[in-house]
Amino acid sequence: MKRFRTVHYTIHSEKIKDARGVRFAVIADLHGMEFGPDNQRLLETINKYRPDGILIAGDMIVRNDSESMKKAESLLKRFSAQYPVYYALGNHEYKLYRSNPEENEFAGEYQEYENELREAGVEILHNDFSKLKVGKTGITVYGLEIPLIYYKKPFSPRLHTEEVRELIGEPSEDSLNILLAHSPKYGDTYFDWGADLILSGHYHGGIVRLNRHKGLLSPQLQPFPAFCCGDFHRGSQHMLVSAGAGNHTCEGRLCRLGNGH
């Protein structure tokens, strides 16, 4: 039986205005996997925690795999029937999103996938943002998409802070800023941009993981990646990197944001 693991993080911020805090479920790199029929076990686990929203950090599908799109679509529709869902693309989605449907049959299927999700209420953030309010707390969720050259193996260019600003603008001054950025390779740039909370995946915990935070090699063949897996912080800023769906595992994140008082 395929298994998944739920990891809990509690993060404190003075931007959280309610004593009860805010709770999100975070999923990355599901790649069309199923945990129980129609992902029933995964859905039941999330329902148990009653999050205020679900944040998707990319790669819910496998590129050029119709079945993975069907499975991801079904799950996300079930999520959106109960919770606000915010979805930023990973490299698998982005490749199809940028492809010509006349040249790639899966690109056309992907367009239908996005259309179906939007109709179901899923907010797909193409270098865009969405504002929400939970109690008295204002939150802005940003979805960052970077060109595929930044996923190149083994060498990819540096991503500069000004490039992130060109893609998604400046962080909001009056809300908690959550950045969905699939690749954790550019964590320092995301911190410099000004995110309060960064949510990434992509690395699957590293090809070989040394400990909670350290991996020997990233999927991009980068040795000892700085932000491989787990939780990182810089002052009051935080970054969570999901290990995602590996060999018969899926790591979900339940992230509780508490006030700083």
Question: Predicted segment positions?
Answer:
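N-terminal membrane-anchoring alpha-helices
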Residues: 1-19
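Membrane-embedded segments
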Residues: 17-123
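Active-site-proximal beta-strand elements of phosphoester/diester hydrolases
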Residues: 21-31, 138-148, 178-181, 238-243
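Active-site neighborhood of phospho(di)ester-bond hydrolases with catalytic His/Asp-centered motifs
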Residues: 26-28, 53-59, 84-91, 125-128, ...
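Short, flexible loop segments at the rims of nucleotide/cofactor-binding pockets, characterized by
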Residues: 30-34, 62-65, 153-158, 176-177, ...
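Solvent-exposed loop/turn segments at secondary-structure junctions
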Residues: 31-32, 60-63, 91-95, 130-132, ...
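Binuclear metal-dependent hydrolase catalytic cores centered on His/Asp/Glu-rich metal-binding motifs
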Residues: 97-122, 129, 134-177, 187, ...
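Conserved beta-sheet core of the metallophosphoesterase superfamily
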Residues: 178, 183-260
